[in-house]
């Protein structure tokens, strides 16, 4: 038996007027998703426990079968692990976005324009962060380059207790009341202001402005935490697993849970990633002897944050055709028994351009026989109609692997 977890980050949504009051899942042409919904157990679940913010770190931890209330230690440490950053028990890791703010003279008067600086390239992002690190790193503060706009700051010999706001939650809003506060609030605020002074006239940003692109004109900190201690996935569930992803968060989760984390050429974590490359690599690692592949695609989430309806529908269709469909067709052609868990981690509604705590639709599919309750298509409304609701989303993985559904 082979297991496929197909996760479209932020794929769930709310009805959108421009789509005829349908969601992107309802509007998309996705025959493979609809097939597993019609032949599997389809319902709704909460991946993020009540009282916790609906972020991808807590949600993907739950999808992998780990209770966030027990195991969650923050987002940035997972990303730091993926970057190869060694974290001591007394270190705090903090996510650092390089992003676009408006250009008022007073930093506090600025507005959050673009949390990703126009999905800045890996090469440009790395160059800018290394430029800042050379000028701003100290014995206490260390900036580390990741990919695109996603980077990491480590505070050594530190404690938790700083209030930080995710930048994608405040797109188009003033930043004055969203600055770091609490234990290291002033330290991080000063770092952000200084970063904007250094980045303002950097050649990369001058070129981006000339090309009509958003400049990466400031750092922004969020997602503090300490390195988690996670029971290995194979020890917990008895199967060997790998994760196919582009973002450091998921790579870090894979590393911390003992999964294989192969490099996927062309996988960017952006709105228009190489979907086919992910499908091919997923099949490749299943062929290498692994039992389970966890395929994470960031594109629907990025589209939701950008408010890009067309791109979100397109991302869902590409996931269906180039990843889920590719895997199902190849496994069926071989006569291989397989199971599919299909779901988002959380919604990223176009309407609000950030994550919501709404439940998400899921499917558990077994290629050997039809399961119930099924749905005629895979979407939020049809999944809700089945009446199947799993309150604790982290329990789905055990049901999936044991085929107890």
Can you name each region flagged by the protein language model?
Residues 1-405:
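Feature captures the catalytic ectodomains and active-site-proximal regions of enzymes
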